[in-house]
Amino acid sequence: MSTDKKQSNFAIDFLMGGVSAAVSKTAAAPIERVKLLIQNQDEMIKQGSLDRRYTGIVECFKRTAADEGVASFWRGNTANVIRYFPTQALNFAFKDKIKAMFGFKKEEGYAKWFAGNLASGGLAGGLSLLFVYSLDYARTRLAADSKSAKKGGERQFNGLVDVYKKTLASDGVAGLYRGFLPSVVGIVVYRGLYFGLYDSLKPLLLTGSLENSFLASFLLGWAVTTGASTASYPLDTVRRRMMMTSGQAVKYDGAFDAFRKIVAAEGIKSLFKGCGANILRGVAGAGVISMYDQLQVILFGKTFK
């Protein structure tokens, strides 16, 4: 393949992956915010921004709508779209580039081929995280910035820029990267399973009449997303709880310290708070990966691999 052809395919991968991600993430913003509120509620109670725990997904929706209005469900979505566009675009674009480096073919053995897919997916996700972590931090702080404890009260942050300004003033650059190490581990586990399993299972399951089926592709993507997100969810909780301590007097000494203290004070179940909402949110992730494949088939008559 010529250099021009490779660059053209790379640009198509980058654009289509990013657009699909941005659209899906915006559609899933309400459940995304509910997930973050439930996940971080114990930290929010400590900080005085939440007066009592949420009893479930529906109750969280009701309370948030009553206290903050329906539009508040998209709080933090701007940062999420800005973050998610390059994250997914880079993942989709570099996934195949990195996979090509391993040079494993299915004929060489399924286990070796599967391991190559797993490694390439994890590495692609880990690399993209280096560039967008501070946006993920800002999105988390905005989404978890509730004012339900005091109706009509002031929020901690007025917007994306304000998150950066206040965090840099109180904690410096380190504050924007709090929870980064467990994030790296989590992103490798999640993305490795996300891309690795999808690429490995797709040619086995989506064959014959199911090969170009949007529903079949969507269901496979949802199943893979659900499994990957559940497996890495405790790491996600630890990193976000660490993020919430930036600007606070008391902080965790590290990921292990956060894990130990959360389990000791709240029980192991606390690591999975919001997991139900996260599974529902996985519909968006499944939509992204299936839309990516379907758009390529519709526009170009094939997928770019």
From Swiss-Prot:
It catalyses: ADP(in) + ATP(out) = ADP(out) + ATP(in). It is a multi-pass membrane protein. GO terms for molecular function: ATP:ADP antiporter activity. The keyword Heme does not apply. One of its GO terms (biological process) is mitochondrial ADP transmembrane transport. It is found in: Mitochondrion inner membrane. ADP binds at residues 83, 95, 239. InterPro entries: ADT_euk_type, Mit_carrier, Mitochondrial_sb/sol_carrier, Mt_carrier_dom_sf. Solcar repeats lie at residues 8-101, 112-204, 212-298. A motif (Nucleotide carrier signature motif) lies at residues 239-244. The chain crosses the membrane at residues 10-37, 78-102, 110-130, 180-201, 215-235, 275-295. The matrix-open state (m-state) is inhibited by the membrane-permeable bongkrekic acid (BKA). The cytoplasmic-open state (c-state) is inhibited by the membrane-impermeable toxic inhibitor carboxyatractyloside (CATR). Keywords: Antiport, Membrane, Mitochondrion, Mitochondrion inner membrane, Repeat, Transmembrane, Transmembrane helix, Transport. Residues 239-244 are annotated as: Important for transport activity. Its main location: mitochondrion. The keyword Magnesium does not apply. GO terms for cellular component: mitochondrial inner membrane. It holds the Pfam family Mito_carr. ADP:ATP antiporter that mediates import of ADP into the mitochondrial matrix for ATP synthesis, and export of ATP out to fuel the cell. Cycles between the cytoplasmic-open state (c-state) and the matrix-open state (m-state): operates by the alternating access mechanism with a single substrate-binding site intermittently exposed to either the cytosolic (c-state) or matrix (m-state) side of the inner mitochondrial membrane. The transmembrane helices are not perpendicular to the plane of the membrane, but cross the membrane at an angle. Odd-numbered transmembrane helices exhibit a sharp kink, due to the presence of a conserved proline residue. Belongs to the mitochondrial carrier (TC 2.A.29) family. Monomer. This is ADP,ATP carrier protein. It comes from Kluyveromyces lactis (strain ATCC 8585 / CBS 2359 / DSM 70799 / NBRC 1267 / NRRL Y-1140 / WM37) (Yeast).
